[in-house]
Amino acid sequence: MKLILTADVDNLGAPGDTVEVKDGYGRNYLLPRGLAIVATRGAEKQVEGIRRAQEARAVRGLDHAKELKDAIEGLENISLSVKTAGDSGKLFGSVTAADVAGAIKAAGGPVVDKRNLELPKAHIKATGKHAIVVNLHPDVVAKFHLNVVGA
């Protein structure tokens, strides 16, 4: 079955690519989820429109990502107050990506998706300064330090 991809599909291709897949994969997975359309003459024109729109969106996305990076890195003091287990500095529970996203917003920064945050490990489990990376765009990465303080 010959299809034209409308979205990025792992191990298959990028939007606008014409691919040959097995009938079942196309009919049962790609087409119902809107990841592809059947390759016809009219569909090729539609794909060209999709490509132009994605290129324009990519340019706007890059500019927006750079603005977010400046806003995040411009924040002076991003800190988070959490319950600690005594004087050792260990935390009750842990600090997750969602907590970090909330701390950025509380410090006056932009709203950041928790899936774009890279914590030093899966979770932060101790007080102190921790380096956080925010993947805003494939070409734009913001870095800042989060100060975890015991309450």
From Swiss-Prot:
Organism this protein belongs to: Rhodococcus jostii (strain RHA1)
Q: Which UniProt keywords apply?
A: Ribonucleoprotein, Ribosomal protein, RNA-binding, rRNA-binding
* GO-annotated cellular components: ribonucleoprotein complex; ribosome
Function summary? Binds to the 23S rRNA.
Matching NCBIfam families, A to Z? L9
A molecular function GO annotation: structural constituent of ribosome
Which Pfam families does this chain map to?
A: Ribosomal_L9_C, Ribosomal_L9_N
> Which Gene3D superfamilies does this one have?
Ribosomal protein L9, C-terminal domain (3.10.430.100), Ribosomal protein L9, N-terminal domain (3.40.5.10)
Q: Which SUPFAM superfamilies match?
A: L9 N-domain-like, Ribosomal protein L9 C-domain
Q: Which family does it belong to?
A: Belongs to the bacterial ribosomal protein bL9 family.
Q: In Gene Ontology terms, what is a biological process of this protein? A: translation
Q: What is this protein called?
A: Large ribosomal subunit protein bL9
Q: What is the lineage of its organism?
A: Bacteria, Bacillati, Actinomycetota, Actinomycetes, Mycobacteriales
